Amino acid sequence: MAKPLATAAASSFPPAEILEILTQVTTLLKSRKETISIAETACGGLLSSSLLSQPGASGIYAGGLTLYTLPSRVAYAGWTQETIANYRGPTTDIVSGLAKHVRRDLASTYTLAESGTAGPTGGNTPNRKPGYVALAVDCERGTFVRELNTELGGDRTANMVRFAVEGLTLLRDVINGEAKL
C-alpha cells in the first residue's frame, strides 16, 4: 500500500515565488468573470498547473497547451513547415502568434503565451541564451508583449519559475489596463 504524501510536500505547490502574483491574477479574473488560456513552452506546464491549483480554477481556466516541441506547434498551434524552417528561437513575434491562435481556438478572454530558453544550455544569440523569455498576452484590446532576461544563467528550474512569474505579471498588467501595446 502506498504511503500518503506528507502535508508539507503537498502544500509546496505552486512555488512560493509564484503564489502572490498568481493569487492577484486569479482574484482579478474571478471578480471580472473572465477566462484565461495558456500557451507555454519553456515553462513546461508550470503556468497551467499553477492556475489549476487555485480554488475556483474551473471558472477561469479555458485550457492550455504545452508546446515544447516544434512538431507539437504544428499539430496544435497552426505552425507550418515554413514556420519551422524560419524558426530562429523564441521571440515576441512567436509568442504573439501562439497567443492569438490559442485565444481564437479556446475563446478565452485572455491568452498568456511564453517561450524562452530555460537552460542549462542555449545558443549564442540573445534570445537563445539561458534566462531569455518572450511573453505575450492576447485579448480583445490587442496583443501585449514583453521580453527579458532573468539573469539567472543556466538554472533551469529557477528560470522556469521566473518565466511564470513574469508571464503572470504581464497578464495582471494587461487586465488592470497598465500594459502598453
Model-predicted regions and their roles:
Residues A2-L181:
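Short alpha-helical segments enriched in small residues
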